[in-house]
């Protein structure tokens, strides 16, 4: 009797650990559903929109300029940020101050990316904290799930490109 109960208990614990490991690998390496909060990505992503983020791109260095990514915040590692990739390592970026009076250039160092929100007037991004390490990127967002009226692939940046050629 006791042997049967212990056997069932160990099987249950084993299955729980096994499924927990499978779920962890799925969310860590494949992707998952994310709710974006804040106005920094408007109009592309509104506050409380639900999107799908895939994580394979970050593992295989498939992040490109124009991609929207989820990353660990450089100023608060407990929170995530949702921003668009403006520059990759080695790029020269045209940066502006919030008032748009002063324009300058910044270089993205090796192993880093330059992230900005689509809503430039209401976004804390690389213009404030500089380029972020590639290792902080958690995944690439490419599909909006909710609201259903916006269901589908995400559109290009409303700000156009701001790369410097000189």
Swiss-Prot record:
Localization, UniProt: Mitochondrion inner membrane
This protein's record includes keyword Protease: yes
Catalytic residues in the record: 40, 83
E.C. numbers: 3.4.21.-
Record key words, sorted: Hydrolase, Membrane, Mitochondrion, Mitochondrion inner membrane, Protease
Biological processes, Gene Ontology terms: protein processing involved in protein targeting to mitochondrion; signal peptide processing
CDD domains membership: S26_SPase_I
Primary location recorded for the protein, binned into one broad class: mitochondrion
Keyword Protease: yes
Gene Ontology molecular function: serine-type endopeptidase activity
GO annotations of cellular component type: mitochondrial inner membrane; mitochondrial inner membrane peptidase complex; mitochondrion
NCBIfam families, sorted: sigpep_I_bact
PANTHER family recorded: MITOCHONDRIAL INNER MEMBRANE PROTEASE SUBUNIT 1, PROTEASE FAMILY S26 MITOCHONDRIAL INNER MEMBRANE PROTEASE-RELATED
Function per UniProt: Catalyzes the removal of transit peptides required for the targeting of proteins from the mitochondrial matrix, across the inner membrane, into the inter-membrane space. Known to process the nuclear encoded protein DIABLO.
Family to which the UniProt record says this protein belongs: Belongs to the peptidase S26 family. IMP1 subfamily.
Subunit organization: Heterodimer of 2 subunits, IMMPL1 and IMMPL2.
The name this protein goes by in its record: Mitochondrial inner membrane protease subunit 1
Organism: Homo sapiens (Human)
């Amino acid at each position: 009797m006791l042997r049967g109960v212990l056997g069932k208990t160990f099987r249950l614990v084993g299955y729980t650990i096994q499924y927990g490991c499978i779920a962890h690998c799925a969310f860590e390496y494949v992707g998952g559903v994310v709710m974006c909060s804040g106005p920094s990505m408007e109009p592309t992503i509104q506050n409380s929109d639900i999107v799908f983020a895939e994580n394979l791109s970050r593992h295989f260095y498939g992040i490109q300029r124009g991609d929207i990514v989820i990353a660990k915040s450089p100023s608060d590692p407990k929170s995530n940020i949702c921003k668009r990739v403006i520059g990759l390592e080695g790029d020269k970026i045209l940066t502006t101050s919030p008032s748009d009076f002063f324009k300058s250039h910044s270089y993205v160092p090796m192993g880093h990316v330059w992230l900005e929100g689509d809503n430039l007037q209401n976004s804390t991004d690389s213009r404030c904290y500089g380029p972020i390490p590639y290792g902080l990127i958690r995944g690439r967002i490419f599909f909006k799930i909710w609201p259903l009226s916006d269901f589908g692939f995400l559109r290009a940046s409303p700000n156009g490109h701001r790369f410097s050629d000189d």
